[in-house]
Amino acid sequence: MKEWTKEQWQEALKQEKLAAFYLYTPMCGTCAVATKMLTVVEELLPQLPIGKANLNYIEELAYEYEIESVPCLLVGREGNVTQKVYAFQSVLNLYEILKN
């Protein structure tokens, strides 16, 4: 998963196909587990654009999307965020969310 800027996320979000943006903070233990789960999903869905960003560096995004906590996975297409995932639960759950 590559680190994305806010601009890179907005560009990916404009596309017709699904894109995901993973928001984390480095001191978050749950984020470390979520990162590992998303890495597996990324291998299973190589065509899906998935980026990540340290929310500490793009705080304006937290306000813009009303992020309540980290980890948070923003999922969207065609300029719209269609889902915000906070409870990652399992690799299978993330796969089911992102395979569409």
Which stretches of residues belong to each language-model region?
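Short acidic-hydrophobic, aromatic-tinged amphipathic segments that line or gate anion-handling sites
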Residues: 1-9
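Thiol-based oxidoreductase modules, predominantly thioredoxin-like and allied folds used
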Residues: 3-4, 23, 42, 46-60
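Local sequence-structure signature of Cys/Sec-based thiol-disulfide redox active-site neighborhoods
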Residues: 8-41
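Short hydrophobic/charged patches on amphipathic alpha-helices used for structural packing
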Residues: 10, 59-62
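Chalcogenol-based redox active-site neighborhoods
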Residues: 64-65, 91
